[in-house]
């Protein structure tokens, strides 16, 4: 009988990527088949996030539910991974003895061995080490699911912002070799992927080894990815302002595949708060980066992260943030009330901002950015937008839906053969969470760039053993 696997994922796109790799890995090694129903699973995995407050409480609440399933089925294996697992380690098992496997973001590739250990010895296993970039050497070949795909290019962060747990839970920055990344993307392109999103905690710090022992910069990697035929849209998430260098901005000038949309976290518009956060840049320096970007790509839209109510934030500090929001005219944002993370320097700072004040400031900020997003959407009416068709519309199965470069969902009338391809549409109406378009031209009528076929990239970056058999090692 087929064994079933259920994965619950919380957190960032890196976690989503990791969960997809876990599913592929366990399907290839143990034959596990994914299920959305925890009750029918033989293996339950929780991929956790520790960015927000009460992350641990959420974990133990869900584990309490899974414990009941294990009481009914003693053979059920429960595993916890991700950043909470990395933070808590053995203490997690002390609070939740029902957990059999505890693994970190850098040890998910060892899941098959850990599961074998549990099955063979009936004893738990904990591995939350940081074995460099080893996990990518032991994951199965990528499997496309639709026209878009995430590809991890690096792990960890060296910035040690005072509010952030990432350096402690995912380790310091480690870049994948550039050939490994290109090989994975070429394989995805050969399966029909048209858009890739390059992932990392700080992608613009990427410095990957090349086959000849040189170093590939992030700007060089962007151009190499964009040159793969079929990959006609490139995104990346997420960046840090202090390493958003001019060579990256130059890619926006000469590489049309790189989208006119950038998520560049700033966190605050107050230099005093930025210093307390150890962000290593000022609001003015952030604005200078955006000014250069708009010179290189006038139609680029910017999104950001904001933390409201950081310890000691005054009304003046908040007003400086709101001024930055207006000056940059952000399209969207991920904004949250500050929550102290255990073990971070900011957790020890005196917090004299009331919860009511924090909530009010967050509401004001989110309302303003929502207004700006609607203004941008309304200005798109009458323009022609290139849309990657992702499938049928959720509003009407007789229509299609896709996304613009600035992540707007567009619904329009079209035929099923357009799914997975690009179309140009004229925007004719704006709604709260989507746009309405009229089809103007299909991909056959476009002049998309061609440079190097996926097969050529695969051949160029392929690794082989001593008898000439290809070994996939991204």
Curated annotation (Swiss-Prot):
Its EC number is 2.8.4.3. Keywords: 4Fe-4S, Cytoplasm, Iron, Iron-sulfur, Metal-binding, S-adenosyl-L-methionine, Transferase, tRNA processing. [4Fe-4S] cluster 1 binds at residues 12, 49, 83. Its cofactor is [4Fe-4S] cluster. It comes from the Bacteria. Binds 2 [4Fe-4S] clusters. One cluster is coordinated with 3 cysteines and an exchangeable S-adenosyl-L-methionine. It is found in: Cytoplasm. One of its GO terms (cellular component) is cytosol. Catalyzes the methylthiolation of N6-(dimethylallyl)adenosine (i(6)A), leading to the formation of 2-methylthio-N6-(dimethylallyl)adenosine (ms(2)i(6)A) at position 37 in tRNAs that read codons beginning with uridine. Belongs to the methylthiotransferase family. MiaB subfamily. Monomer. This is tRNA-2-methylthio-N(6)-dimethylallyladenosine synthase.
